[in-house]
């Protein structure tokens, strides 16, 4: 996802959501507020809410929709059967009283929800099991790193949630504060390495992006 794509699109339906939208917008330089034509004066106007959300979703843009979660889900439902990566999508109450991550757990939606929650002084409604238990999403490493195999990573997290301990090999400072069940003799391992190889069984392999690009 490029820097431009990382900036969320803030979508509102009416004037009542504009103040909250502007507060969120101030947190993300370059973000635009999209408002329904004829109802609210925003940075950009649209005429069909569902079409707008689907266009943003297909363009891999993070979406912050100030409306009921059900409206967002129904609008994006035709696209959700497709396999592949999805951008962060969250619903936000018009008055800023609730922040609900909906889609994009592996694309940083919970991080986005926490950032917006800080702006609005509310706790986001995070439901991701791994993140609630460990305090982080191990399948969403920070910028500059990439998973070697997402599908194996999902199985790895299932084993962690099942109670298996883990050891960490390599420089993974972002995991220092994570509540992982660490054991230096564990069979499961999170391994951060520039070595371009296939992950071994019981291993979550993470590569630095810059080194991976050089090897390619």
Give the predicted meaning of each segment.
Residues 1-63, 68, 75-88, 92-216:
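SAM-dependent methyltransferases
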